Regions:
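N-terminal [4Fe-4S]-dependent radical SAM core
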Residues: 1-28
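Canonical Radical SAM [4Fe-4S] cluster-binding loop centered on the CxxxCxxC motif
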Residues: 21-61
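Local cysteine-cluster metal-coordination motifs and their immediate loop/turn environment
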Residues: 34-46, 306-309, 346-364, 383
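Short Fe-S-cluster ligation motifs
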Residues: 65-84, 337, 376-423
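Radical SAM/AdoMet-radical enzyme domain recognition
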Residues: 67-82, 91-229
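Flexible glycine/acidic-rich beta-alpha junction loops that bind and position SAM and/or redox cofactors
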Residues: 147-152, 208-244, 266-279, 305, ...
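C-terminal accessory region of radical SAM enzymes
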Residues: 243-278, 309-353
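Short, small/polar residue-rich loop motifs at catalytic or cofactor-binding pockets
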Residues: 289-292
């Protein structure tokens, strides 16, 4: 939901409803949680249990209903479809051809944008032609050099996927497919921020670093830990999670290379979002907004949830078989979910000087306890504080450059004169 000029520490549903516009996004799971890989840290594989473990795929009638509802329901002139999983390509090539046809049927003058997140192992020449013809932006999951990537991103035979992903990246380059990289920051990445960044910038010019910080329980007889909502009693940090300190160090190390060598040439989502919050403009990523809830998640059977990190039965909002996306987005439950990002911050966050930069970050990470004993502190808080403290003089200088209508890249000569962190 759009940040509002309300300065109190609590926003009510009525206030939000009066300010809200029906501009929303969707993330759709055409094949649910189905995936050809078995990544250790995947937060979505568990969702198969909600739907009885069946091999799911959204049928064509429901696909048409979804596309029509979304285009007609949002007040936005540009409608962005986010195809996600699991692995969305499991839905099949013909399924996506049909989706493109339906988008054009119902576009009604609106601009249609398609983005798709993939593990990169099922893409072939035919897929590349489809992506290029329909101007897809493809997000490819790649965690870094081979030993880091293959530590957790393996197929169902236990084999690493690095070589297949790199072949896909080369194929998309040849076909002129626009792509970027999503890299998780996990226990194996710790201490290797500069190395990971230098590798990834050789592959792409846009990187999203996603911290892996999960709360899990081990159920009797289960093959893997079960990722649970933040407030679950008895849950513990997952073994693949990165610590707050290690995450902060990782991002500081990435930043120190980037700010000296790559401003304006390579784009790192966290850096862009942080600078945007310094400029008091929308950060472009929900985790760094004051409130959330702008993007509904649509499962393969039409079930709708407020966020793909909160696909649990207790968060189910409705189903497009009998509800409309527009009504679900405007419902009190959805608005309350988005407002809770701000309204449930612990006292430590309310007093924090960095609150305007992170707004408590993603609610899925809020399973720590503050020094004063308040529940709901972000488990990565110390790491974000380290990052914000370290980058503050650089961010303030880039903000000053932007105010003077100069490019942020002009900071690099000054940045190179600043002392480097050890080991870089």
């Amino acid at each position: 939901m759009t940040p509002m000029a309300l300065n109190r520490e609590y926003i009510t549903f009525g206030e939000a409803a009066r300010h809200a516009r029906r501009i929303f996004g969707t993330m759709v799971k055409p094949a649910g949680s189905a995936c050809n890989l078995d990544c250790a840290y995947c937060y979505y594989l568990d969702k198969a249990a909600i739907y009885g473990g069946r091999e799911p795929r959204m049928d064509f009638d429901l696909l048409e209903r979804y596309i029509q509802q979304y285009i007609e329901g949002t007040d936005a002139d540009t409608v962005t479809f986010v195809w996600h999983g699991g692995e969305p390509l499991i839905a099949g090539y013909d399924w996506f051809v049909r989706a493109m046809e339906l988008q054009q049927r119902y576009a009604a003058g609106k601009h249609i944008v398609n983005t798709l997140q993939t593990n990169g192992t099922l893409v072939d020449e035919r897929w590349c032609d489809l992506f290029r013809a329909n101007n897809f932006l493809i997000g490819v999951s790649l965690d870094g050099p081979q030993d880091i990537h293959d530590a957790f991103r393996r197929d169902r035979l236990g084999k690493g996927t690095f070589d297949r992903v790199m072949e896909t990246v080369d194929m998309m380059r040849r076909h002129g497919v626009e792509y970027n990289i999503l890299a998780t920051v996990n226990a194996r990445s710790a201490g290797r921020g500069a190395e990971v960044y230098r590798f990834l910038r050789s592959v792409t010019d846009f990187i999203q670093f996603l911290p892996v910080s999960e709360h899990v329980i081990m159920e009797q007889g289960a093959a893997r830990p079960h990722i649970v909502p933040p407030a679950t009693e008895g849950a513990v940090p997952a073994p693949w999670s990165i610590s707050a300190a290690a995450f902060g160090e990782f991002m500081c190390d990435v930043f120190d290379v980037w700010v000296r060598e790559d401003v304006g040439r390579c784009f790192v989502q966290l850096f862009d979002a942080t600078l945007a919050n310094y400029m008091n403009v929308p950060p472009g990523v929900c985790s760094m907004c004051e409130t959330c809830g702008e993007t509904l998640v649509v499962e393969h059977n039409g079930d709708v949830y407020p966020c793909d990190h909160f696909v649990y039965p207790e968060f189910l909002l409705g189903n497009i078989g009998h509800d409309t996306l527009r009504d679900i987005f405007g419902s009190e439950r959805q608005l309350q979910f988005g407002l809770a990002k701000r309204n449930t911050l612990p006292r430590e966050c309310l007093r924090c000087q960095y609150r305007p930069l992170c707004h408590g970050e993603c609610p899925k990470h809020r399973f720590a306890v503050s020094k004063s004993g308040d529940a709901g502190l972000n488990a990565l808080c110390a790491g974000y504080k380290l990052f914000f403290r370290h980058t503050q003089p650089y961010m303030e200088r880039m903000r000053h450059l932007l105010v003077k209508q100069q490019p942020p890249a002009a900071i690099m000569p000054w940045a190179r004169r600043q002392p480097m962190r050890k080991g870089l």
